[in-house]
Amino acid sequence: MSPGRSVSGGRRAFHVKRSAREAFRRQLDAWGVKASREQLSLLEEYALLLAGYRRANVIGTREPETVLLEHVLDSASCLLFEPLRAAGRVADVGSGGGLPGIPLKILLPEARVVLIESTGKKADFLRYAIESLGLSGVDVVNARVEAVAREAAHRSRYDAALARAVAALPVLAEYCVPLLRVGGHAVAMKGGMPEHELRLGEGAAAVLGARLSGVLEVPRLPEVGEEKRRRLVILEKRRETPGRYPRKAGVPAKRPLRGGG
């Protein structure tokens, strides 16, 4: 998509202001995330698709600049965790509108990305976005992650599993860790998170065969909202997850794991 191109969103045409595009590029540069002109164009077009989509509520804002600078940029921040840049197979758990999976697919064209989303209308949007952007090497799985993680095609198959705005850390651990190969990483994208949630997440990870590897602060330039705290919580899988996990659909959220199992 050439700069300035608009995407129609019903009665109104959407476009991203030049100032927002430039701030987006500067933040990527500050993070050391390389993006070609074509990749930047695809990321902008994706933001416009999110802002303009009307068939389902896939995102909470209709402002293209907000979508680009908060949601798409937030997704790209996962690449501050450098091992992710070399991941060959990535799962986006609870993908929603494709965040962070679609931006990461654009920035990591060689990676195989699987978007796991249980809501049918959101899965429809994901397929629409993939087709509209001309992406390959990215698939949509319309199912609960608790079921997906028990399938041989997905269990212990991923180098990385990502989750953004899905659930508390102990719940995310049970969703993500069973998908990982030993040595793989779960990346939980968090804003403000109380210390007790981190400790509970660490205990849940241990039950699942993983450990808390680190917490990365996400620095932001003033023009993209430096006051908005973001953190990446990293779990590393050290051994195979016991076969009883994840538990049946809905149970991880209702009864989150604790360190005792």
From Swiss-Prot:
Keywords: Cytoplasm, Methyltransferase, rRNA processing, S-adenosyl-L-methionine, Transferase. S-adenosyl-L-methionine binds at G94, L99, E117, S118, T119, V145, E146, R164. It is found in: Cytoplasm. One of its GO terms (cellular component) is cytosol. InterPro entries: rRNA_ssu_MeTfrase_G, SAM-dependent_MTases_sf. GO terms for molecular function: rRNA (guanine-N7-)-methyltransferase activity. Pfam families: GidB (PF02527). Its EC number is 2.1.1.-. SUPFAM superfamilies: S-adenosyl-L-methionine-dependent methyltransferases (SSF53335). It is an enzyme of class 2 (transferase). Specifically methylates the N7 position of a guanine in 16S rRNA. HAMAP family: 16SrRNA_methyltr_G. Belongs to the methyltransferase superfamily. RNA methyltransferase RsmG family. PANTHER family: S-ADENOSYL-L-METHIONINE-DEPENDENT METHYLTRANSFERASES SUPERFAMILY PROTEIN. This is Ribosomal RNA small subunit methyltransferase G. It comes from Rubrobacter xylanophilus (strain DSM 9941 / JCM 11954 / NBRC 16129 / PRD-1). The gene is rsmG.
